[in-house]
Amino acid sequence: MRLILLLSLFVVAFAAELPLAEECDETKCLLPRCRCSSTNIPGGLAPRDVPQFVSVTFDDAVNVINIETYREVLYGRSNSNGCPAGATFYVSHEYTNYVLVNELYNRGYEVSLHSMTHQTPQTYWAEADYDVLVKEFADQKSLMSHFALIPDQEIRGVRLPFLQMNGNASFQMMADSGLVYDNSWPTVSHVNPGLWPYTLDYASIHDCIVPPCPSASIPGPWVIPMISWSDLNGSPCSMADSCYFTPPLDDENAWYNFILTNFERHYHGNRAPFGFYIHEWYLAVNPAVKAALVRFMNYVNNLNDAFMVNANQIIEWVQNPIPVSEYIRRPCRRFSSTPCRATSCGPLRSEHNGLDYWMQVCNTCPRVYPWLGNPLGR
């Protein structure tokens, strides 16, 4: 209780520098730049006319081990409209192989930010000020663009470590750094119907599960709510691998039905985006869960009105909502691939802990291992 009080005092102090968000005025908060937090479908569409977006995401470092899972379960997939199926990777820096990050980007998947350090304790993230968050995320954007050869403007999203909210500071950092959306904020109160993405121009109805949550008016960044699943006991879980009462981990059919039940709450409801949020290790140690995910993605890829997409594609649709009958006729997403000249670097001394690291990059080698305050390792 004392921790929550301290965190609340911290966010109030920071918010003093920013205007307090007021109740949303729908006559002033208009697409494409502003949207009130609401379970109402963008554009006033009927549920049957809404494309059901599915957001498959993976967190943490990309390496030679987990890339095998990504290649196995994701590569070569297409939605029913013929466009490539998307997924989003929230990448943390330490131990990441940037040649493989480049591979994911060139396959059309979205690469977003999960911090430079992903350090513990969790209170570090709750208490981090604006300057710390610039070093953790804005500098990571520069690092990712440089070493994985991803165009700076293609790196758009953030997921805070441990889903630990930070009040206003993280969103202010995003607004100043050209970052488009956050996908860290769980909701257990706005699940059925689900909470659609929105901006922070005005006060949010979003329940604050991991305080402190933003209180200021911060135009620019979007929130993609992490709409919780319900486990077999009816308890909420923000990520698939955080559910407590699950089917047996060796029962593929039971897990498939578990995923499908949570999906259908969206699909037969207001069609707010459905998230399958997970860490790769959970699939690696539970082959039946991996097989269930593959079956579920196969199912989605054969539905005429459901689409696996990158997270930013959800924001783009919300900004310009069109019926599914039009959506399926739109051209597929286009982007410029960036060929990588793979370079192995190391040993690189880390100035933060004195250890030696090896890096795989698509650029010239850094002098030292990149870290806070020195994202390019110069």
Model-based region annotation:
Residues 2-16:
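Cleavable N-terminal signal peptides of Sec/SRP-targeted secreted and luminal proteins
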Residues 9, 18, 23, 28-30, ...:
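Processing junctions and N-termini across compartments
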Residues 17-112, 117-122, 130-136, 141-146, ...:
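Active-site beta->alpha N-cap acidic-glycine motif
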Residues 122-126, 235-237:
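Short acidic, glycine/proline-rich loop/turn micro-motifs
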Residues 126-129, 195-202, 323-325:
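Short low-complexity, flexible loop/linker segments enriched in glycine and/or proline
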Residues 197-266:
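Aromatic-lined glycan-binding groove of carbohydrate-active enzymes
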Residues 311-357:
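C-terminal regions of proteins
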